[in-house]
Amino acid sequence: MSDKEYTSTLHLPKTDFQMKANLPNKEPKYIKKWTEEKIYEKGLEKNKNGETFILHDGPPYANGNTHIGHALNKILKDIILKYKTFRGFRSPYVPGWDTHGLPIELQVVKEVGVGKAREMSALEIRKLCEKYAKKWVGIQKEQFIRLGVLGDWDNPYLTLDPRFEAKQLELFGEIYVNGYIFKGLKPVYWSPATETALAEAEIEYYDHVSPSIYVRMQANKDLLDKIGFNEDVYVLIWTTTPWTLPANVAICLNENFDYGLYKTEKGNLILAKDLAESAFKDIGIENFELIKEFKGKDLEYTTYKHPFLERTGLIILGDHVTADAGTGAVHTAPGHGQDDYVVGLAYKLPVISPIDHRGCLTEEAGDLFKGLVYSEANKAIIKHLTETGHILKMQEISHSYPHDWRSKTPVIFRATEQWFIRMEGGDLREKTLKVIDKINFIPSWGKNRIGSMMETRPDWCISRQRVWGVPIPIFYNDETNEEIFHKEILDRICDLVREHGSNIWVEKSPEELIGEELLVKYNLKGLKLRKETNIMDVWFDSGSSHRGVLEVWEGLHRPCDLYLEGSDQHRGWFHTSLLTSVASTGDSPYKSVLTHGFVNDGEGKKMSKSLGNTVSPEDVIKVYGADILRLWCGSVDYRDDVRISDNIVKQMSEAYRRIRNTARYILGNSYDFNPKTDKVAYKDMLEIDKWALNKLEVLKRSVTESYDKYEFYNLFQGIHYFAAIDMSAFYLDIIKDRLYTEKKDSVARRAAQTVMYEVLMTLTKMVAPILSFTAEEIWESLPAETRESESIFLADWYVNNDEYLKPELDEKWQQIIKLRKEVNKKLEKARQGENKIIGNSLDAKVSLYTEDNTLKEFIKENLELLKIVFIVSDLEVVDSADGNYTDAEEIEKLKIKIAHADGEKCERCWKYDELGTDSEHPTLCPRCAAVLK
């Protein structure tokens, strides 16, 4: 037989599993399979009697395409739920969307035109908003499905779903009845750009340039008498919001600070002693003399003149006055600041807020300034105060200032009548902090973060002055302005909304909504009634999902097991969900909270379109496939901010290729293996096979532990090392000769195939939650009789096998691996240069010399094994070494020589040996000749 004919006697690899992944084209096929074959539903059915694990989906906003942060979030959730399903948990996934709110309403107004929108009714706007939201839900849904996320995509939850809205109204009613909801005139964040109140979670901070002014306010006689001084005296204040001075009704001091009366060229000025030097330097006052000193509390209840209005201001005391900056005398306008409002309550100060919804000053600000936008009012007030001698210094400063997160424009504090959930006073804060202690936070610092936010958060403003949202279900007696709330009436509203949706609130009159029977029962018949026109904050919408979803969708329950979102949700969805839950039922809606960081570019910079450093999921999928994106999600330590760039994605692609090649090699060499008939018992395996199974067993336990702890980045490192190093670079390389050249059904060959089968089945399950498409492709490439289920996602998790754990093999095989590395380095050199000795390793004879007797004995005892491991034709240990030996790099006292092997090359296995021992096969080595008998 010729060399070519002998090739046909080898058991060469056969598989349809391609080396080139071609994921962008293949992946849609598997999405189609999972959808048509209802794999998600079958997974639930398979585990119907198992313990439930509920991960509740935080709803993304239905506006615009998904971004890389969405992809990270959805894939992390999918990894967890697929793993839990493998482990026998019944793990439903109901995806959701946040569908009300200002961004959608603004987009609709923009599309129809501001002028036309103003002519439209609230109902018309609402219908357009619903259509717009549903359009983006459809688009985003397809984008999420393309990521390989399994879930109940045909029945997602939308916050505009009538069932959800009805539950939200019920929740509002419970919190109202519990005494935590009230209506009050309070300063709130207000966006003039979008003409509505904002919650804290809707505020972002950016650098902003503001005027910084020192203003002197003239003291009245009672203050002069208090300090025993009969010349003109001024209290010096500092502010960066001159437009709020029309609302000034007090100056706040710290009762424990030392204040001084200073004689200066700018008049006799009162300010805190600790701040006097810095303030005078800032103003440019070089000569000053301390005339008198006193405590802040000594001036309480004295008065001063407003600088441009006929108003007397009061000197008051407050703990919020610090010595960090300014003068220690704080301009106080309860209508324009939270601290001012709180201290104003104690002194029964009027809440004046002379600014309208567009940011224009009203008549209350005085004739000089009414009608001016607040930014223009700043200039006009500064000009007037300069002319009247009240301003001592004006300059511009850049500082961090609150902005509307949607319009990116500065916000103001404005006192308006709003609906609030009460945090100041009452027991909600204390109750919530106690509940937080019982929640498991991952990472653990999340507990302190949400706790510290809860300790300091003000009353939550839950009303918005827009049309697209869930109505606040309150009626009024229009003549007395008295609130009308009865649980029976609310129950009827909930029933109507559940049947018709929240548009019914806009469509029907108060009388129609309440109904004849309840009008009579509560003595409302004949009264002129009106409905509340404000809607609820969208954070109340999403914060109601523990009721609107977990109590409504079949198979879900509260508290759920896990909320998983970005770390910004400590002040967002985690926060609002917790507050609404504690305020209604006194408990948490979730047992555990897992947070991930933000996605930055490759250099750690925040992504922005203007910088051109954004990475879109769609672009990654088009070029590399969703599995590469999934692998990135599974490889990063998501607990901190993570990075992505084209280079990082390429690195992921390389790591993926190594895992894929390992799978392909095993599939190619398992084509004739049936585990039911060909499996070899552990006791009959070679030692190297047992070493491989020990490595696999250690990895199995490590991977399971990492999945249980949600530490996917740890398991990825382990899987990648096992596949690329332990398997491809070592074990699979060494057993190639056995697989190709031994008899088809020999114990040696079948043992290697048994190990490979175990490795592949286990490895496929390990990677399936992350590399979902590739795992399914591997599963499909297995012979049908070896697959335990129609889809990898209907299989059971692997079972640990204590028999495979052989830690005693580790030390020996670590030494063997070290020797192989040293020999491989020398073999590589022998292949190179003009005087190359060998073409491949089977051409080689390796000679080893060592003065280390322990090492020498080790090599002698394992000589035949090492020859197989080194993949060489001959190996010897010598007692002396000449100049042709070179030192090993990392093993002391070891010298190595590479020579060409003696004998002739076997035409079948390519090893050098004594040929011609078999007349029928004169060009084969004795082993190959025997195999062919």
UniProtKB/Swiss-Prot annotation:
EC number of the protein: 6.1.1.5
Binding site for ATP: K609
Source organism of this protein record: Fusobacterium nucleatum subsp. nucleatum (strain ATCC 25586 / DSM 15643 / BCRC 10681 / CIP 101130 / JCM 8532 / KCTC 2640 / LMG 13131 / VPI 4355)
The protein's role, per its UniProt record: Catalyzes the attachment of isoleucine to tRNA(Ile). As IleRS can inadvertently accommodate and process structurally similar amino acids such as valine, to avoid such errors it has two additional distinct tRNA(Ile)-dependent editing activities. One activity is designated as 'pretransfer' editing and involves the hydrolysis of activated Val-AMP. The other activity is designated 'posttransfer' editing and involves deacylation of mischarged Val-tRNA(Ile).
UniProt cross-references to HAMAP family, sorted A to Z: Ile_tRNA_synth_type1
Required cofactor names: Zn(2+)
ATP-binding in keyword set: yes
Protein name according to UniProt: Isoleucine--tRNA ligase
